[in-house]
A protein has these predicted regions:
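Active-site rim/loop-helix segments in enzyme catalytic domains that contact anionic ligands
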Residues: 2-129, 256
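Metal-dependent de-N-acetylase/amidase catalytic core
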Residues: 2-32, 113-261
Length: 261
């Protein structure tokens, strides 16, 4: 089987090569972003998703954990926090312009396990949603402390392999009526060895708006206790500008691109 099976767009045909880097995939038709927690997707690839959504792509979100540990408040009602974070994630997706599904798998925050059951579930989502491009955590990021981020990346990579091959997880056809599906490309954010960038110069404000939908994270992740997000916005703008500068861009998000799926 080739990397691009019939019906898939030649996504890399319009990617520009700059030495060891490629840039700006042809806007895909269907995209699946897979994050460990609510807000991980917006941090990792929010500008890219906003750009593709504006080009007509169907953007889907898949969040693996319930986000129940995402607070410094030791007395927090975790059930309420889970519900709140799901609401925030849906609102963030809307702000990116995403019109696809927002799915929550509900694994306990901090206890995400890279096992066959989770790989099966994510592979089923890939087969059902048929993304051209999948985006997720780089599981090989050195010194990555959070186990959910490492495991989410491994689950994503293993699920792509399971979803693409017809003899893996054959019960999906019998039970759900979905055949195998091979995405054309995988983009891993926070990449240990980045080799691809997307120009998001026109989408920084949209990324920020989506991040700011995660109001429960203002204190813990965004480092504000009074609702003043100016310092947080400055950090994000500076980070995107720093990533874009070597490529002559005002802002960029960078990834490790794997296109031999």
């Amino acid at each position: 089987m080739s990397a691009n099976e019939p019906g898939q767009p030649p996504l890399l045909s319009s990617a520009l090569s700059h030495g060891e880097w490629t840039s700006n995939l042809q806007p895909p038709h269907v995209v699946l972003a897979i994050g460990a927690h609510p807000d991980d997707i917006e941090f990792g690839c929010g500008g890219t998703l906003a750009k593709w959504a504006a080009s007509g792509a169907m953007i889907h979100h898949l969040v693996l954990t319930d986000g129940s540990k995402g607070t410094w408040d030791v007395d927090a009602d975790t059930a309420q926090l889970i519900e709140r974070r799901q609401h925030e994630q849906r609102r963030a997706a809307q702000r990116l312009g995403a019109t696809g599904e927002v799915r929550f798998l509900g694994a306990v925050d901090g206890e995400l396990v890279h096992d066959s059951s989770m790989v099966d579930t994510v592979a089923l989502a890939i087969r059902q949603l048929t993304p051209d491009v999948v985006l997720g955590h780089d599981p090989w990021k050195r010194y990555r402390l959070h186990p959910d981020h490492r495991n989410a990346g491994l689950i994503t990579c293993d699920a792509i392999v399971a979803a693409r091959d017809p003899h893996f997880l054959r019960h999906h056809m019998a039970t759900h009526g979905v055949p195998h599906h091979r995405p054309a490309a995988l983009l891993l954010w926070e990449a240990d060895e980045p080799n691809h960038y997307e120009d998001v110069s026109g989408w920084v404000d949209t990324k920020l708006a989506a991040l700011e939908a995660h109001e429960s994270q203002f204190e813990s992740t965004m480092k504000t206790t009074d609702g003043d997000l100016s310092a947080f916005r400055g950090r994000i703008r500076d980070r995107l500008a720093t990533l874009g500068a070597p490529h002559g861009l005002g802002a960029a998000e960078i990834f490790h691109l794997i296109d031999q799926l």
